[in-house]
């Protein structure tokens, strides 16, 4: 909420995006990370940031910054097996403060940390309400806005609006561009220092194929050619077996996305998929 102090532990891509959003919503934000380049990046965006590796005690810093009150909330976006992160999050929180885990950390919690301050702890479920709900994600059954304000879709819409309005800067977070053939440079070391966001660059002259040739099947001359639009369950379970039984020649199988058509075309022995 407006005026609250929130600590973001871990200033990677998610941490820096979250810190900017919190600041845009009127929160006082403190960032914590051991990578000085990321600390400097946060500072360049007006975020108070500290590096524990440089001798700064983050718990003491938060206490001093808040006048001994503690942080209203702690957002953990770090990735580490250490249990010390959750302990420090409790220590820097005010009484009845909130801790939200977005990253992956060691969770050997101490009961006293939570009991004495009546802290609340929550694990974030990625995109928001609707995640892992088949009715929402696959069937398009939305939640009423009056009862569920922030769903996956509404969260994404808000982020896109924040980017377009300039209140969220993501372009400056791109630290490297790598050719697709060299993708291992990114995925081989996801935690290298200084790396925040990476872009895979596809060849500019690469040919985009909308029709994929499946095989070199030989067909008997004189028979008609059949094209199929739709590669769903009915086509796979009913239509294709009937055509195969009749030794029909399938010239094309088409689907909206192309991938399902390609898979079914290989199974059915069709010539092309699109």
Residue ranges of predicted features:
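Mid-domain Rossmann-like dinucleotide-binding core that forms the NAD(H)/NADP(H) cofactor-binding site
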Residues: 1-55, 60
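Glycine-rich Rossmann-fold phosphate-binding loop(s) that bind the pyrophosphate
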Residues: 10-12, 104, 231-232
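Conserved S-adenosyl-L-methionine
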Residues: 24-28, 95, 245-250
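Conserved acidic E/D residue at the C-terminus of a beta-strand in Rossmann-like folds
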Residues: 33-34, 125, 252-256
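C-terminal capping/lid region of NAD(P)-dependent oxidoreductase domains
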Residues: 40, 64, 68, 73-75, ...
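Short acidic-hydrophobic, aromatic-tinged amphipathic segments that line or gate anion-handling sites
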Residues: 48-54, 174-182, 272-274
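Glycine-rich phosphate-binding loop and adjacent beta-alpha segment
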Residues: 82-158, 206-221, 238
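N-terminal Rossmann-like dinucleotide-binding module
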Residues: 208-268
């Amino acid at each position: 909420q407006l005026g609250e102090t929130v600590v973001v532990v871990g200033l990677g891509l998610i941490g820096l995006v979250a810190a900017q959003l919190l600041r845009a919503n009127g929160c006082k934000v403190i960032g914590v990370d051991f990578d000085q380049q990321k600390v400097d990046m946060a500072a360049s965006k007006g975020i108070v940031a500290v590096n524990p590796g440089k001798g700064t005690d983050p718990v003491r810093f938060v206490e001093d910054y808040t006048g001994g009150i503690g942080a209203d909330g702690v957002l953990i976006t770090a990735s580490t097996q250490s249990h010390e992160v959750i302990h420090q999050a409790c220590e820097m929180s005010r009484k009845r403060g909130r801790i939200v885990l977005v990253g992956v950390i060691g969770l050997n919690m101490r009961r006293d940390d939570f009991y004495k301050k009546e802290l609340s702890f929550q694990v974030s479920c990625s995109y928001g309400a609707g995640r892992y709900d088949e009715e929402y994600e696959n069937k398009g059954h939305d939640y009423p806005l009056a009862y569920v304000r922030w769903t996956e879709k509404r969260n994404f819409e808000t982020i896109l609006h924040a980017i377009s309005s300039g209140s969220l800067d993501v372009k400056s977070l791109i630290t490297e561009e790598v050719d697709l053939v060299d993708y291992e440079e990114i995925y081989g070391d996801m935690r290298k220092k200084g790396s925040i966001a990476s872009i895979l660059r596809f060849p500019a002259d690469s040919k985009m194929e909308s029709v994929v040739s499946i095989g070199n099947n030989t067909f008997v001359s004189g028979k008609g050619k059949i094209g199929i639009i739709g590669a769903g369950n009915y086509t796979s379970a009913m239509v294709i077996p009937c055509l195969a039984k009749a030794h029909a020649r399938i010239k094309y199988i088409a689907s909206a996305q192309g991938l399902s058509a390609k898979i079914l075309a290989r199974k059915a022995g069709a010539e092309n998929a699109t």
